[in-house]
Protein backbone atom coordinates (compact mmCIF):
# COMPACT_ATOMS: atom_id res chain seq x y z
CA UNK A 1 0.00 0.00 0.00
CA UNK A 2 1.37 3.41 -0.98
CA UNK A 3 1.89 6.41 1.28
CA UNK A 4 -1.29 8.16 0.09
CA UNK A 5 -3.45 5.09 0.55
CA UNK A 6 -1.87 4.35 3.93
CA UNK A 7 -2.58 7.88 5.11
CA UNK A 8 -6.16 7.69 3.83
CA UNK A 9 -6.66 4.33 5.54
CA UNK A 10 -5.42 5.74 8.86
CA UNK A 11 -7.71 8.76 8.45
CA UNK A 12 -10.72 6.62 7.56
CA UNK A 13 -11.97 5.94 11.12
CA UNK A 14 -11.78 9.63 11.95
CA UNK A 15 -13.73 10.56 8.82
CA UNK A 16 -16.43 7.97 9.58
CA UNK A 17 -15.76 6.35 6.22
CA UNK A 18 -17.99 3.42 5.36
CA UNK A 19 -17.76 1.11 2.40
CA UNK A 20 -20.26 2.56 -0.08
CA UNK A 21 -20.49 -0.37 -2.50
CA UNK A 22 -22.31 -3.62 -1.87
CA UNK A 23 -20.87 -7.07 -2.57
CA UNK A 24 -23.09 -7.35 -5.65
CA UNK A 25 -21.84 -4.02 -6.98
CA UNK A 26 -18.24 -5.10 -6.50
CA UNK A 27 -18.94 -8.31 -8.38
CA UNK A 28 -20.50 -6.37 -11.26
CA UNK A 29 -17.53 -4.01 -11.20
CA UNK A 30 -15.20 -6.94 -11.86
CA UNK A 31 -17.25 -7.79 -14.96
CA UNK A 32 -17.27 -4.22 -16.29
CA UNK A 33 -15.59 -3.56 -19.63
CA UNK A 34 -14.80 -0.09 -20.92
CA UNK A 35 -16.59 0.75 -24.15
CA UNK A 36 -16.27 3.97 -26.15
CA UNK A 37 -17.02 5.15 -29.68
CA UNK A 38 -16.54 8.25 -31.82
CA UNK A 39 -13.84 10.86 -32.05
CA UNK A 40 -13.78 14.61 -31.65
CA UNK A 41 -12.56 17.21 -34.13
CA UNK A 42 -9.09 17.89 -32.74
CA UNK A 43 -8.46 14.38 -31.46
CA UNK A 44 -6.51 13.01 -34.48
CA UNK A 45 -3.76 15.67 -34.35
CA UNK A 46 -3.75 15.65 -30.55
CA UNK A 47 -3.21 11.87 -30.61
CA UNK A 48 0.21 12.48 -32.13
CA UNK A 49 1.11 14.74 -29.20
CA UNK A 50 -0.41 12.41 -26.59
CA UNK A 51 1.41 9.36 -27.99
CA UNK A 52 4.67 11.30 -27.91
CA UNK A 53 4.04 12.52 -24.37
CA UNK A 54 3.17 9.15 -22.86
CA UNK A 55 6.47 7.72 -24.13
CA UNK A 56 8.25 10.28 -21.93
CA UNK A 57 6.48 9.03 -18.80
CA UNK A 58 8.44 6.47 -16.73
CA UNK A 59 6.87 3.03 -16.58
CA UNK A 60 6.80 3.04 -12.77
CA UNK A 61 4.43 6.04 -12.64
CA UNK A 62 0.83 4.98 -11.94
CA UNK A 63 -1.94 6.29 -14.23
CA UNK A 64 -4.00 7.61 -11.31
CA UNK A 65 -0.99 9.56 -10.05
CA UNK A 66 -0.71 11.21 -13.46
CA UNK A 67 -4.38 12.23 -13.37
CA UNK A 68 -4.17 13.49 -9.79
CA UNK A 69 -1.13 15.67 -10.50
CA UNK A 70 -2.96 17.26 -13.42
CA UNK A 71 -6.09 17.85 -11.36
CA UNK A 72 -4.15 19.48 -8.51
CA UNK A 73 -2.43 21.87 -10.93
CA UNK A 74 -5.78 22.74 -12.52
CA UNK A 75 -7.44 23.32 -9.14
CA UNK A 76 -4.61 25.31 -7.55
CA UNK A 77 -4.12 27.61 -10.56
CA UNK A 78 -7.85 28.35 -10.64
CA UNK A 79 -8.02 29.02 -6.89
CA UNK A 80 -5.23 31.60 -7.24
CA UNK A 81 -7.23 33.40 -9.93
CA UNK A 82 -10.40 33.20 -7.85
CA UNK A 83 -8.62 34.82 -4.90
CA UNK A 84 -8.03 37.86 -7.11
CA UNK A 85 -11.52 37.76 -8.68
CA UNK A 86 -14.02 36.57 -6.03
CA UNK A 87 -16.99 38.26 -7.73
CA UNK A 88 -15.80 37.72 -11.33
CA UNK A 89 -15.76 41.48 -11.92
CA UNK A 90 -12.19 42.21 -10.87
CA UNK A 91 -8.96 42.11 -12.84
CA UNK A 92 -5.97 39.97 -11.88
CA UNK A 93 -2.23 40.00 -12.67
CA UNK A 94 -1.41 38.60 -16.10
CA UNK A 95 0.52 35.68 -14.60
CA UNK A 96 -2.63 34.30 -12.92
CA UNK A 97 -4.33 33.86 -16.30
CA UNK A 98 -1.15 32.38 -17.73
CA UNK A 99 -0.97 29.98 -14.79
CA UNK A 100 -4.59 28.91 -15.43
CA UNK A 101 -3.80 28.29 -19.10
CA UNK A 102 -0.81 26.15 -18.17
CA UNK A 103 -2.73 24.34 -15.43
CA UNK A 104 -5.64 23.46 -17.71
CA UNK A 105 -3.43 22.40 -20.62
CA UNK A 106 -1.32 20.21 -18.33
CA UNK A 107 -4.48 18.64 -16.90
CA UNK A 108 -5.85 18.01 -20.39
CA UNK A 109 -2.57 16.41 -21.45
CA UNK A 110 -2.18 14.21 -18.38
CA UNK A 111 -5.86 13.25 -18.40
CA UNK A 112 -5.49 12.15 -22.02
CA UNK A 113 -2.48 9.91 -21.40
CA UNK A 114 -3.49 8.20 -18.16
CA UNK A 115 -5.37 5.50 -20.05
CA UNK A 116 -2.46 5.07 -22.44
CA UNK A 117 -0.10 4.69 -19.49
CA UNK A 118 -2.44 2.09 -17.99
CA UNK A 119 -2.40 0.00 -21.16
CA UNK A 120 1.33 0.57 -21.55
CA UNK A 121 1.98 -0.82 -18.07
CA UNK A 122 -0.83 -3.42 -18.16
CA UNK A 123 -2.43 -1.73 -15.16
CA UNK A 124 -5.88 -0.95 -16.57
CA UNK A 125 -8.70 -1.50 -14.09
CA UNK A 126 -12.24 -0.31 -13.33
CA UNK A 127 -10.71 1.85 -10.59
CA UNK A 128 -8.75 3.78 -13.21
CA UNK A 129 -11.86 4.48 -15.29
CA UNK A 130 -13.80 5.63 -12.24
CA UNK A 131 -10.88 7.75 -11.02
CA UNK A 132 -10.49 9.41 -14.42
CA UNK A 133 -14.15 10.40 -14.70
CA UNK A 134 -14.20 11.46 -11.05
CA UNK A 135 -11.33 13.88 -11.62
CA UNK A 136 -13.09 15.21 -14.73
CA UNK A 137 -16.25 15.90 -12.72
CA UNK A 138 -14.22 17.99 -10.26
CA UNK A 139 -12.13 19.70 -12.93
CA UNK A 140 -15.20 20.94 -14.81
CA UNK A 141 -16.26 22.92 -11.73
CA UNK A 142 -12.94 24.76 -11.66
CA UNK A 143 -12.91 25.27 -15.43
CA UNK A 144 -16.27 27.01 -15.01
CA UNK A 145 -14.84 29.23 -12.27
CA UNK A 146 -11.78 30.15 -14.31
CA UNK A 147 -13.94 31.00 -17.31
CA UNK A 148 -16.25 33.42 -15.51
CA UNK A 149 -13.31 35.09 -13.77
CA UNK A 150 -11.21 35.47 -16.93
CA UNK A 151 -13.93 37.19 -18.98
CA UNK A 152 -15.39 39.06 -15.97
CA UNK A 153 -18.85 37.60 -16.41
CA UNK A 154 -19.89 39.11 -13.09
CA UNK A 155 -21.04 42.10 -15.14
CA UNK A 156 -23.69 39.84 -16.72
CA UNK A 157 -25.20 38.02 -13.70
CA UNK A 158 -27.72 35.85 -15.52
CA UNK A 159 -25.18 34.61 -18.03
CA UNK A 160 -22.66 34.07 -15.25
CA UNK A 161 -25.10 31.71 -13.51
CA UNK A 162 -25.70 29.89 -16.79
CA UNK A 163 -21.97 29.41 -17.45
CA UNK A 164 -21.30 28.28 -13.88
CA UNK A 165 -23.76 25.41 -14.09
CA UNK A 166 -24.08 24.42 -17.74
CA UNK A 167 -20.69 22.69 -17.77
CA UNK A 168 -21.65 20.52 -14.80
CA UNK A 169 -24.96 19.70 -16.46
CA UNK A 170 -23.40 18.68 -19.77
CA UNK A 171 -20.77 16.47 -18.15
CA UNK A 172 -23.47 14.79 -16.08
CA UNK A 173 -25.51 14.26 -19.27
CA UNK A 174 -22.50 12.59 -20.93
CA UNK A 175 -22.43 10.05 -18.08
CA UNK A 176 -26.22 9.79 -18.13
CA UNK A 177 -26.05 8.85 -21.82
CA UNK A 178 -23.42 6.21 -21.00
CA UNK A 179 -25.63 4.83 -18.22
CA UNK A 180 -28.42 4.43 -20.76
CA UNK A 181 -26.60 2.96 -23.76
CA UNK A 182 -23.58 1.35 -22.08
CA UNK A 183 -21.06 3.13 -24.31
CA UNK A 184 -19.25 6.43 -23.81
CA UNK A 185 -19.93 8.36 -27.02
CA UNK A 186 -17.64 11.18 -28.15
CA UNK A 187 -19.03 13.93 -30.36
CA UNK A 188 -17.29 16.06 -33.00
CA UNK A 189 -17.20 18.86 -30.43
CA UNK A 190 -16.35 17.40 -27.04
CA UNK A 191 -14.42 18.02 -23.83
CA UNK A 192 -11.03 18.31 -25.56
CA UNK A 193 -12.30 21.15 -27.74
CA UNK A 194 -13.73 22.86 -24.65
CA UNK A 195 -10.45 22.60 -22.75
CA UNK A 196 -8.39 23.91 -25.65
CA UNK A 197 -10.82 26.80 -26.23
CA UNK A 198 -10.69 27.83 -22.57
CA UNK A 199 -6.88 27.55 -22.59
CA UNK A 200 -6.74 29.93 -25.57
CA UNK A 201 -9.13 32.28 -23.76
CA UNK A 202 -6.83 32.33 -20.72
CA UNK A 203 -3.86 33.13 -22.96
CA UNK A 204 -5.74 35.96 -24.67
CA UNK A 205 -6.64 37.42 -21.28
CA UNK A 206 -3.03 37.11 -20.09
CA UNK A 207 -1.73 38.96 -23.17
CA UNK A 208 -4.46 41.58 -23.65
CA UNK A 209 -5.80 41.90 -20.11
CA UNK A 210 -9.35 41.17 -18.88
CA UNK A 211 -10.45 44.52 -20.34
CA UNK A 212 -10.35 42.79 -23.73
CA UNK A 213 -13.70 41.16 -23.00
CA UNK A 214 -15.35 44.50 -22.20
CA UNK A 215 -14.47 46.09 -25.54
CA UNK A 216 -17.41 46.68 -27.81
CA UNK A 217 -17.72 44.63 -30.99
CA UNK A 218 -17.99 47.11 -33.91
CA UNK A 219 -21.50 47.76 -35.23
CA UNK A 220 -23.14 45.54 -32.61
CA UNK A 221 -22.96 47.38 -29.31
CA UNK A 222 -22.13 44.05 -27.66
CA UNK A 223 -19.07 43.35 -25.49
CA UNK A 224 -16.37 40.94 -26.67
CA UNK A 225 -17.39 38.48 -23.97
CA UNK A 226 -20.45 37.79 -26.11
CA UNK A 227 -18.25 35.70 -28.42
CA UNK A 228 -17.29 33.02 -25.86
CA UNK A 229 -20.87 33.15 -24.56
CA UNK A 230 -22.22 32.31 -28.02
CA UNK A 231 -19.68 29.49 -28.25
CA UNK A 232 -20.86 28.07 -24.94
CA UNK A 233 -24.51 28.32 -25.98
CA UNK A 234 -23.80 26.66 -29.33
CA UNK A 235 -21.82 23.89 -27.65
CA UNK A 236 -24.64 23.34 -25.17
CA UNK A 237 -27.26 23.01 -27.89
CA UNK A 238 -25.08 20.67 -29.97
CA UNK A 239 -24.00 18.43 -27.11
CA UNK A 240 -27.35 18.23 -25.35
CA UNK A 241 -29.16 17.40 -28.58
CA UNK A 242 -26.78 14.46 -29.06
CA UNK A 243 -27.08 13.33 -25.45
CA UNK A 244 -30.85 13.42 -25.31
CA UNK A 245 -31.25 11.80 -28.72
CA UNK A 246 -29.45 8.77 -27.28
CA UNK A 247 -31.22 8.92 -23.91
CA UNK A 248 -34.71 9.23 -25.37
CA UNK A 249 -34.07 6.50 -27.95
CA UNK A 250 -34.06 3.94 -25.17
CA UNK A 251 -31.34 2.00 -23.42
CA UNK A 252 -29.69 -1.39 -23.75
CA UNK A 253 -31.58 -2.86 -20.80
CA UNK A 254 -34.85 -4.75 -20.82
CA UNK A 255 -37.67 -2.86 -22.59
CA UNK A 256 -35.32 0.00 -23.45
CA UNK A 257 -34.19 0.64 -19.88
CA UNK A 258 -30.71 1.59 -18.62
CA UNK A 259 -27.85 -0.85 -18.06
CA UNK A 260 -29.30 -1.33 -14.56
CA UNK A 261 -32.81 -1.98 -15.83
CA UNK A 262 -34.12 1.37 -14.54
CA UNK A 263 -35.95 4.19 -16.29
CA UNK A 264 -33.78 6.13 -18.73
CA UNK A 265 -35.15 9.36 -17.23
CA UNK A 266 -34.42 8.54 -13.59
CA UNK A 267 -30.89 10.06 -13.48
CA UNK A 268 -32.41 13.41 -14.45
CA UNK A 269 -33.87 13.76 -10.97
CA UNK A 270 -30.44 14.14 -9.38
CA UNK A 271 -28.96 16.85 -11.58
CA UNK A 272 -32.40 18.45 -11.83
CA UNK A 273 -32.54 18.81 -8.05
CA UNK A 274 -29.07 20.39 -7.96
CA UNK A 275 -29.99 22.94 -10.63
CA UNK A 276 -33.41 23.65 -9.12
CA UNK A 277 -31.99 24.33 -5.67
CA UNK A 278 -29.19 26.47 -7.11
CA UNK A 279 -31.67 28.54 -9.14
CA UNK A 280 -34.22 28.92 -6.34
CA UNK A 281 -31.65 30.00 -3.77
CA UNK A 282 -30.11 32.43 -6.28
CA UNK A 283 -33.46 34.03 -7.10
CA UNK A 284 -34.87 34.11 -3.57
CA UNK A 285 -31.78 35.45 -1.82
CA UNK A 286 -32.37 38.82 -0.15
CA UNK A 287 -28.63 39.52 -0.02
CA UNK A 288 -27.77 38.71 -3.66
CA UNK A 289 -25.87 35.69 -2.39
CA UNK A 290 -24.79 34.40 -5.79
CA UNK A 291 -23.93 37.80 -7.24
CA UNK A 292 -21.80 38.72 -4.22
CA UNK A 293 -20.12 35.31 -3.96
CA UNK A 294 -20.34 33.56 -7.35
CA UNK A 295 -17.17 31.52 -6.92
CA UNK A 296 -18.02 30.29 -3.42
CA UNK A 297 -21.60 29.58 -4.55
CA UNK A 298 -20.39 27.58 -7.55
CA UNK A 299 -18.04 25.53 -5.39
CA UNK A 300 -20.80 24.74 -2.89
CA UNK A 301 -23.03 23.32 -5.63
CA UNK A 302 -20.16 22.10 -7.81
CA UNK A 303 -18.98 19.63 -5.17
CA UNK A 304 -22.54 18.28 -4.99
CA UNK A 305 -22.66 17.92 -8.78
CA UNK A 306 -19.27 16.19 -8.79
CA UNK A 307 -20.39 13.62 -6.24
CA UNK A 308 -23.65 12.69 -7.95
CA UNK A 309 -21.79 12.46 -11.27
CA UNK A 310 -19.25 10.07 -9.74
CA UNK A 311 -22.09 8.01 -8.30
CA UNK A 312 -23.69 7.85 -11.75
CA UNK A 313 -20.38 6.65 -13.24
CA UNK A 314 -20.20 3.93 -10.59
CA UNK A 315 -23.87 3.03 -11.17
CA UNK A 316 -23.05 2.48 -14.84
CA UNK A 317 -19.95 0.41 -14.08
CA UNK A 318 -21.77 -1.73 -11.49
CA UNK A 319 -25.09 -1.86 -13.39
CA UNK A 320 -26.92 -0.63 -10.30
CA UNK A 321 -29.58 1.93 -9.46
CA UNK A 322 -28.60 5.41 -8.29
CA UNK A 323 -30.50 6.53 -5.22
CA UNK A 324 -31.92 10.04 -4.94
CA UNK A 325 -31.34 10.09 -1.19
CA UNK A 326 -27.82 11.41 -0.71
CA UNK A 327 -25.86 13.30 1.91
CA UNK A 328 -24.59 15.50 -0.93
CA UNK A 329 -27.79 17.53 -0.66
CA UNK A 330 -27.24 18.51 2.99
CA UNK A 331 -25.34 21.69 2.08
CA UNK A 332 -27.86 23.02 -0.45
CA UNK A 333 -30.64 21.93 1.92
CA UNK A 334 -29.24 24.17 4.66
CA UNK A 335 -29.27 27.14 2.31
CA UNK A 336 -32.83 26.37 1.23
CA UNK A 337 -34.25 25.98 4.74
CA UNK A 338 -32.40 29.03 5.99
CA UNK A 339 -34.17 31.05 3.30
CA UNK A 340 -37.47 29.34 4.11
CA UNK A 341 -37.17 30.63 7.67
CA UNK A 342 -36.39 34.18 6.49
CA UNK A 343 -32.61 33.79 6.66
CA UNK A 344 -32.37 33.86 10.44
CA UNK A 345 -28.66 33.04 9.98
CA UNK A 346 -26.54 35.25 7.74
CA UNK A 347 -26.67 33.71 4.23
CA UNK A 348 -22.95 34.24 3.72
CA UNK A 349 -22.15 32.17 6.81
CA UNK A 350 -24.55 29.41 5.74
CA UNK A 351 -22.98 29.41 2.27
CA UNK A 352 -19.56 28.78 3.78
CA UNK A 353 -20.98 26.00 5.94
CA UNK A 354 -22.71 24.46 2.91
CA UNK A 355 -19.51 24.59 0.87
CA UNK A 356 -17.44 22.94 3.61
CA UNK A 357 -20.07 20.22 4.13
CA UNK A 358 -20.31 19.54 0.39
CA UNK A 359 -16.54 19.35 0.03
CA UNK A 360 -16.13 17.10 3.08
CA UNK A 361 -18.89 14.80 1.83
CA UNK A 362 -17.30 14.56 -1.62
CA UNK A 363 -13.87 13.90 -0.12
CA UNK A 364 -15.23 11.25 2.24
CA UNK A 365 -17.03 9.45 -0.57
CA UNK A 366 -14.08 9.56 -2.98
CA UNK A 367 -11.63 8.22 -0.40
CA UNK A 368 -13.96 5.45 0.72
CA UNK A 369 -14.91 4.24 -2.75
CA UNK A 370 -11.30 4.31 -3.99
CA UNK A 371 -10.05 2.37 -0.98
CA UNK A 372 -12.87 -0.15 -1.21
CA UNK A 373 -12.37 -0.83 -4.92
CA UNK A 374 -8.58 -0.95 -4.58
CA UNK A 375 -8.84 -3.41 -1.69
CA UNK A 376 -11.32 -5.59 -3.57
CA UNK A 377 -9.19 -5.69 -6.74
CA UNK A 378 -5.98 -6.08 -4.71
CA UNK A 379 -4.35 -3.09 -6.35
CA UNK A 380 -2.97 0.24 -5.18
CA UNK A 381 -4.61 3.56 -6.04
CA UNK A 382 -1.42 5.53 -6.69
CA UNK A 383 1.12 2.81 -7.40
CA UNK A 384 1.46 0.13 -10.04
CA UNK A 385 1.03 -3.08 -8.09
CA UNK A 386 2.66 -6.39 -8.89
CA UNK A 387 -0.78 -7.97 -8.61
CA UNK A 388 -2.78 -5.87 -11.04
CA UNK A 389 -6.37 -6.43 -12.06
CA UNK A 390 -6.73 -8.05 -15.45
CA UNK A 391 -6.99 -5.81 -18.49
CA UNK A 392 -10.66 -4.89 -18.88
CA UNK A 393 -10.68 -2.57 -21.86
CA UNK A 394 -13.06 -3.10 -24.77
CA UNK A 395 -13.07 -0.16 -27.16
CA UNK A 396 -14.80 0.44 -30.44
CA UNK A 397 -12.37 3.24 -31.28
CA UNK A 398 -9.70 2.68 -33.87
CA UNK A 399 -6.92 4.26 -31.85
CA UNK A 400 -5.74 4.40 -28.27
CA UNK A 401 -7.79 6.93 -26.38
CA UNK A 402 -9.57 7.47 -23.08
Swiss-Prot record:
Effect of residue 133 to A: Almost completely abolishes the enzymatic activity
Entry annotation: catalytic residues: 133 (proton acceptor)
Transmembrane annotation, as ranges: 63-83, 94-118, 126-150, 161-179, 191-207, 223-248, 266-281, 294-316, 330-339, 347-376
GO molecular function: diacylglycerol cholinephosphotransferase activity; metal ion binding
Membrane topology summary: Multi-pass membrane protein
Outcome when changing residue 50 to A: Reduces the enzymatic activity to about 55% of that of the wild type
PANTHER family: CHOLINEPHOSPHOTRANSFERASE 1 (PTHR10414:SF32), ETHANOLAMINEPHOSPHOTRANSFERASE (PTHR10414)
Protein name per UniProt: Cholinephosphotransferase 1
Amino acid sequence: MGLAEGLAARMAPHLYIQEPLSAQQLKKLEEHKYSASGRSLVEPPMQVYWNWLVEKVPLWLAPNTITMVGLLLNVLSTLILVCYCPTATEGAPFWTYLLCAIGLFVYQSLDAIDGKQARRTNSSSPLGEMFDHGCDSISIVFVNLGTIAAVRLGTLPGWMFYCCFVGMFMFYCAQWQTYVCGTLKFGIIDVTELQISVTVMFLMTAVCGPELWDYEIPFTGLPMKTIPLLGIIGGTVYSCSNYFRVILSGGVGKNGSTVAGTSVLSPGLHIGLVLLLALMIYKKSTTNLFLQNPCLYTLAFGFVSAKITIKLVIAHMTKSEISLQDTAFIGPGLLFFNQYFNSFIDEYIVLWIAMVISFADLLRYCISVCLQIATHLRISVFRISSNQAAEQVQTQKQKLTD
